[in-house]
Amino acid sequence: MWMAWCVAALSVVAVCGTSHETNTVLRVTKDVLSNAISGMLQQSDALHSALREVPLGVGDIPYNDFHVRGPPPVYTNGKKLDGIYQYGHIETNDNTAQLGGKYRYGEILESEGSIRDLRNSGYRSAENAYGGHRGLGRYRAAPVGRLHRRELQPGEIPPGVATGAVGPGGLLGTGGMLAADGILAGQGGLLGGGGLLGDGGLLGGGGVLGVLGEGGILSTVQGITGLRIVELTLPRVSVRLLPGVGVYLSLYTRVAINGKSLIGFLDIAVEVNITAKVRLTMDRTGYPRLVIERCDTLLGGIKVKLLRGLLPNLVDNLVNRVLADVLPDLLCPIVDVVLGLVNDQLGLVDSLIPLGILGSVQYTFSSLPLVTGEFLELDLNTLVGEAGGGLIDYPLGWPAVSPKPMPELPPMGDNTKSQLAMSANFLGSVLTLLQKQHALDLDITNGMFEELPPLTTATLGALIPKVFQQYPESCPLIIRIQVLNPPSVMLQKDKALVKVLATAEVMVSQPKDLETTICLIDVDTEFLASFSTEGDKLMIDAKLEKTSLNLRTSNVGNFDIGLMEVLVEKIFDLAFMPAMNAVLGSGVPLPKILNIDFSNADIDVLEDLLVLSA
């Protein structure tokens, strides 16, 4: 148990301590992002979560202001439009009344803020209206002599006016046309109780304007209740890349909403364009993250169906205003959910992907992704690990040269939406894993491969007479091939070479399982590699190009190694190469990200670079 814990701890240290060197680059266009987001919306329950009742209080705080920038500044003399915060404030003086507000007929708003009621009994006589109430009223006649003139003080009424129009019998006095008992203000008059504009009249309190006033349908959002989103169509997604920032996301959808109003049930259909500015960042763990900076909803094509009654146009306006307030709080969270799914997809890149039964491949981000006007570029460091062991470092042993830096990628084609570039270093790491696991080592015996000539001392003796002299009776041979150093991968324009330096030990199998070595040969081979894709894997197929032999040791004396070139080449072509291709047959896993499909990708071999375009 202690040993297992130590191995696990060392593996973690190895992963954390590995330098972030780019050996794989992925480029995607905005279309890939759009398709990925559309697919996630279709598969997830993000839309279903929005089908709910609008909670009370939603709409008082715009999503894109209070959730991002904080509350707006407070204006001391600014009044709220119909009691709901809007972007624009109404700048008013302190002594102005509000349309449909608190003030009723017969009331005066004093300069200090109090309300004076002119309808009580104390104002029904001329005496109270002018002289008798002089001590309480704010207006008074200016005392002045016959031959003297002076300036009027604030609040004074000229004497002629005070005793004329405002006096008893005057226009505004008791009994006058405009007095409390007159045609306009008297009981039953135009402005009186029960009159056209009076309290209880058609346009007064309780009438049409009462509906519009304090507590009326237009004073608060509560004029519409029971709002519930009942249907949300699958959004049409569009993405615009913002160089150096991230993306500008747009979700166009149709929303069906039910609700109630004072004049009937509402069926609301509205077209909504949810727009969000999204910044691409990288968190502390090294994963890229898409984060909303701002979210807005643009409404259009609002249709309201209701039992037609009073003021349908005013109800339409109210619906427009209410939806503009409440929909951001309900629909912008959908963007949060979708981006969370995209971030989860980006995190899947870091998961271990099996490389057959021998090891695994892990793609990690080596730097902050690059956003241009044409594509999003993800720099990846691909780690190849042994099954239950450590990571494969490239190069390891031979060839003892430093890995080349990641070459510059070619421009993306007009019809290319995804581009994956893999360096020769990464492909070499995959072959190194096979070498370390001894997957390339092979023992070949007589009769194992029908295509080969008989592997006996008689066959070898025909080439090397000293073998026939030493083994006059035919004995079976064993050809033991070992790859002691990691293979190397060389990528050139339209050509990929895999170099394998192996040893071939020729042994005689004798009775009682005795094995005697005849010679040890260094075999320097070159294979032409071809690439294809199958599902989410890169397939590699090798074909023998040439072999070069060098005699290292011999127990039958020196001989011309060139005599064995034909036989050894056949052994590597008909036995070693199929065995190596069988091991490579499991394929190299490609990064699983954003639902990119490379199954029909075009593959180009460039200098030190393998490029897949889909």
Curated annotation (Swiss-Prot):
Any one Pfam family match given in the protein's UniProt record, by short name: LBP_BPI_CETP
Glycosylation sites: 273
Keyword Signal listed: yes
Signal peptide start and end residues: 1-18
SMART domains: BPI1, BPI2
GO cellular component: actin cytoskeleton; cytosol; extracellular region
Keyword set includes Cell membrane: no
Record GO terms (molecular function): lipid binding
Chief location: secreted
Localization, UniProt: Secreted; Cytoplasm
Keywords: Cytoplasm, Disulfide bond, Glycoprotein, Secreted, Signal
InterPro entries: Bactericidal_perm-incr_a/b_dom, BPI_fold-BPI/LBP, Lipid-bd_serum_glycop_C, Lipid-bd_serum_glycop_N
Protein name, entry field: BPI fold-containing family B member 4
Gene: BPIFB4
